[in-house]
Amino acid sequence: MDPNFSESLNGFEYFDGNPNLLTDPMEDQYPPPSDTLLKYVSEILMEESNGDYKQSMFYDSLALRKTEEMLQQVITDSQNQSFSPADSLITNSWDASGSIDESAYSADPQPVNEIMVKSMFSDAESALQFKKGVEEASKFLPNSDQWVINLDIERSERRDSVKEEMGLDQLRVKKNHERDFEEVRSSKQFASNVEDSKVTDMFDKVLLLDGECDPQTLLDSEIQAIRSSKNIGEKGKKKKKKKSQVVDFRTLLTHCAQAISTGDKTTALEFLLQIRQQSSPLGDAGQRLAHCFANALEARLQGSTGPMIQTYYNALTSSLKDTAADTIRAYRVYLSSSPFVTLMYFFSIWMILDVAKDAPVLHIVDFGILYGFQWPMFIQSISDRKDVPRKLRITGIELPQCGFRPAERIEETGRRLAEYCKRFNVPFEYKAIASQNWETIRIEDLDIRPNEVLAVNAGLRLKNLQDETGSEENCPRDAVLKLIRNMNPDVFIHAIVNGSFNAPFFISRFKEAVYHYSALFDMFDSTLPRDNKERIRFEREFYGREAMNVIACEEADRVERPETYRQWQVRMVRAGFKQKTIKPELVELFRGKLKKWRYHKDFVVDENSKWLLQGWKGRTLYASSCWVPA
């Protein structure tokens, strides 16, 4: 690599081909590169902040599965000879000139939801169908005298009340949730005008590492305000510190889970009542964890099928009316308070550039591209270098979103990236693939060409693939790894959530989930004030949904299936990969950056078994590695 690579980034010392030149990471005076990522999220937030309801920025498996079930019967009944949707991947591709080539790669006839989801209705019609589905699902709710849950659709604010009526032979617990289902807004226009001057100005502010628009000046004050407010809040609490009762939430939660697993609803409800009385979404880390897990346990009591869980979660959040902009805003605060995502992005960019020197074409296949947060800084970094690829190709693979246009989100991502490449004079070609089952993607669909350097990136998304729990012979997780191996990439960057709450047995999975999420809630408690609205929203929309899926769902509905980095290592070797060594200097560089960027001292960066590990207070939460075909 070019030893002056840090200078090529216009002053942002992201990487250096000779790490020995960065033995003292504190020497540079440049702002943290995470500011660039934060600005990118901010500008996407500007696009989303139109006041209308939009789908969440993240994949909601339960909502998608419920939509599938609704549409399956409708499509079966209404499909005629004149319209027969092809069971195929939706692929859209275009080059930097803006011309679009739409094509579908036909596959063998399969069920409608085998490859991708196709919605034949507008969003408004889907909402009406969804309401009917809720009514049908309500018929299957338990009506035992021991536990009655009444879901009322009201227009007033959500009220949660738990009333205990102890008798000689029964325990009745009643919980009322408002369910305010609003009509989903109409789909927006098909194409985004990337040539619009307002969008062009936005791009200048978002991702250009321009010395005249210093990201430290733009965002450092906001980031520090968030962190300083945490310190101020702690000081204020010391003055009004009251002695509070210590509650062992882990024990209460575990006992409740054990009662549920044995079918003892009465005992489970007694523990739930105790947890509800002591927990709070606005309390300390333990109280927030208990509140989150209590919701998940109650959902499991209601039923472990996807539609029923989705109905329950919608009842909990119906009055909150969060838009996609709200979710992105919460995600932005997460990025400012945690280095996990930023360092994972830098690690992948480092490894890709290391193998792409002097390549005529660099082709990046990104499994789970979503908004493509990490690629704008990559595009700018190669624009002024001589030893970089002369052309960039990106194939973005993502799960389809609900609605009439499953590939809309990743198409918009491609247009943003195409605009960046056009502004930096980087020849660019993009292809979007929306597929519900990544293991069914074929190598021909990826359009791999000779004489190009092929890099595969999978950031935190392979955990959502099914594993051997369903079938040891047809494991989607191994099938995707086999697909990547058959692609014969020059480098494969794999980032994971390091967790062991993927056991098929509920109690084992529950205990591990408690330990994992305890660290995450504690991290927020040490870096953000407790009354921060974005923190509350992030914990609800991200940790809450994940915990709900891990605890309440089973079989195909359970899509949160993380494994430890040691388990992934065995799986990768079995798939035919060998691991590349991580230079110790790179680990030291990242450690130095954590100190320079003023992240909390309890964030940990380490290396073990050729994995770059990131964690909190000694608990490993994320891991990144680099692989090549054996």
Curated annotation (Swiss-Prot):
Stretch list, region Leucine repeat II (LRII)? 412-444
Q: Provide the residue span(s) of the region labelled PFYRE.
A: 454-549
Q: Where in the cell is it found?
A: Nucleus
Which InterPro entries does the record cross-reference, listed alphabetically?
A: TF_GRAS
Q: Which residue ranges are recorded for the region named SAW?
A: 552-628
Segments carrying the region annotation (VHIID) are 331-396
Q: Which keywords describe this protein according to UniProt?
A: Nucleus, Transcription, Transcription regulation
Region annotation Leucine repeat I (LRI): where it falls in the sequence? 247-312
Q: According to its UniProt record, where is this protein mainly located?
A: nucleus
Q: Which residues form the GRAS domain?
A: 240-628
Chain positions of motif VHIID:
362-366
Protein role: Probable transcription factor involved in plant development.
Protein family according to the UniProt entry = Belongs to the GRAS family.
* Full protein name: Scarecrow-like protein 34
| Record organism | Arabidopsis thaliana (Mouse-ear cress)
* Gene name for this UniProt entry: SCL34
